[in-house]
Design a protein with these regions (language model features):
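Conserved beta-strand signature within the Rossmann-like core of class I S-adenosyl-L-methionine
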Residues: 203-211, 405-409
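Class I SAM-dependent methyltransferase SAM/SAH-binding core
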Residues: 129-162, 348, 354-357
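Extended interfacial segments that mediate partner engagement and assembly in macromolecular machines
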Residues: 50-146, 221, 226, 294-314, ...
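A short glycine-rich, Lys/Arg-flanked "PGG" loop and its adjoining helix->strand segment in the class I
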Residues: 190-205
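Flexible, glycine-/basic-rich loop-and-beta segments that form/coincide
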Residues: 258-301
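A conserved beta-strand element that flanks and buttresses the S-adenosyl-L-methionine
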Residues: 178
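N-terminal juxtadomain amphipathic helix
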Residues: 2-90, 253, 263
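Short, glycine-/aromatic-enriched active-site segment of Class I SAM-dependent methyltransferases
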Residues: 208-231, 235-238, 242
């Protein structure tokens, strides 16, 4: 077990010596984004900043899984969390779409539903309102309290095969088990997948949503690399581990979350595979999704992009323009630290989550403020750090009367748009 230099919160971490999925000992380095604090470790202005941990991804030479080379103690990352699903209108609206799709597959029957990593219960609230019996599991004690206060029963714990057995004993097997943007966060993925199988009724359905590696690769989403995301999952890599536990994919949908995600549907029996599932597999194959060459090109392009992004921001500073950021997301932390941008460049970062206000961003040390307070600084330029919510955030800026330059870091090449 390694630790970093002393600070108020020293982050314990381990460097892996083998693949987390297949245990092969050859995991090749792909991209090194330097030493960075864990992305959601916001801190008070008068406190010492959080410690830094290497942020590197590699590729298993055997099973091709793309994964972080360091594992930060999950208790330090997830026991107290600052991301609330309900603060993003895109996610709230998508919850209704997600429920529609689920009910189409379950043919409208009332189901018992377990969600792993249920956050504030936004998705389960929609399903409960539609007549389903719901239960959430989430390790963040503070967010579990929010969920329970809103009427969503939630167990505050890390999901595992042992917890799954307890849930089944105290409740029942579930018709549907959902894991949305959870599987990339889990070091012992075998225990979680085994637990999902353990929780699932014989004719049940497991639904896995994850930021899709083909889009990460094609659109250069290197900012989705941070210490909470231990994997960059493809459909291929998800199927690889799910199949080991008898879970078989039969359909796939797309989701707007994280700038583009897959929603894959699995069952314990062989079901007819949808055309969209076959098309997704073919697309990943055409990209050589697991190849070392593809990810080495990704790393080269990411390195070039970081420099271009920094130059745009520094160029605006040289013209005496006042700059704020919008969206103190986890991915913004990777982006800012990789580009070595800080409070000397960006006056403040606006965020719609009140829990983050008055806190400092890790590494870049920029104050997070309310949207109104950020606009009161009279910015000439807004850096759209949470670019994956572009439509929502641009609409908010326009409605507030902002007129000026907006730097769009991703996807693709960083560029400026005028509004």
């Amino acid at each position: 077990m390694s630790t970093n230099t002393p600070s108020v919160e020293v982050h314990e971490f381990e460097t892996i010596d083998r693949c987390r999925i297949c245990q092969n000992q050859k995991v090749d380095l792909i991209l090194d984004l330097g030493d960075q604090p864990p992305a959601n470790c916001l801190y008070k202005q008068n406190d010492n900043p959080p410690s830094r941990v290497p942020l590197r991804i590699g590729r298993c030479a055997s099973c091709s899984t793309i994964q972080l080379l360091e594992t930060v103690n999950p208790e330090q990352l997830f026991s107290k969390y600052v991301w609330l699903t309900q603060t993003a209108k895109t996610a709230v609206n998508y919850a209704e779409v997600f429920a529609d799709r689920l009910e189409k597959i379950t043919t409208g029957k009332s189901c018992s539903i377990l969600e792993v990593g249920s956050n504030d219960g936004t998705f389960l609230k929609v399903l409960h309102r539609r007549g389903h019996k719901v239960l959430g599991v989430d390790p963040a004690v503070n967010i579990g309290k929010v969920a329970r206060e809103s009427g969503v029963p939630t167990v505050s714990d890390f999901f595992s095969v042992n917890l799954a057995r307890d849930l089944v004993k105290n409740h029942q097997k579930f018709d549907v088990v959902i894991a949305r943007n959870v599987l990339p966060h889990v070091s012992d993925l075998h225990s979680v997948i085994a637990g999902i199988k353990e929780s699932l009724a014989v004719d049940g359905i497991a639904i896995f949503e994850f930021h899709r590696a083909d889009m990460i690769l094609e659109e250069l989403h290197y900012d989705s690399i941070y210490h909470e995301h231990l994997y960059l999952h493809s459909l291929k890599s998800i199927e690889n581990i799910a199949n080991r536990y008898g879970l078989l994919a039969f359909d796939v949908d797309e989701s707007p979350i994280s700038g583009g995600s897959f929603v894959a549907y699995f069952s314990l029996s062989v079901l007819a595979e949808s055309p969209s599932l076959k098309a997704a597999r073919e697309h990943e194959s055409s990209l050589q999704i697991g190849s070392l060459d593809a990810w080495q090109r990704f790393a080269e392009n990411a390195t070039d992009h970081i420099l271009k992004f920094r130059n745009i921001v520094v160029g605006a500073i040289s013209e005496n323009k006042r700059i704020i950021g919008f969206g103190a997301s986890a991915r913004s932390s990777t982006l800012l630290n990789a580009a070595q941008l800080c409070g000397d460049h960006i006056l403040a970062i606006a965020d719609n989550n009140a829990w983050k206000h008055s806190l400092m961003t890790p590494g870049s040390a920029i104050k997070i403020v309310s949207f109104d307070e950020a606009l009161s600084l009279r910015p000439d330029v807004v850096v759209l750090l949470a670019w994956n919510f572009k439509s929502e955030l641009l609409a908010q800026l326009k409605n507030a009367g902002f007129s000026g330059e907006v730097i769009i870091p991703l996807p693709g090449s960083p560029h400026i748009e005028l509004i």
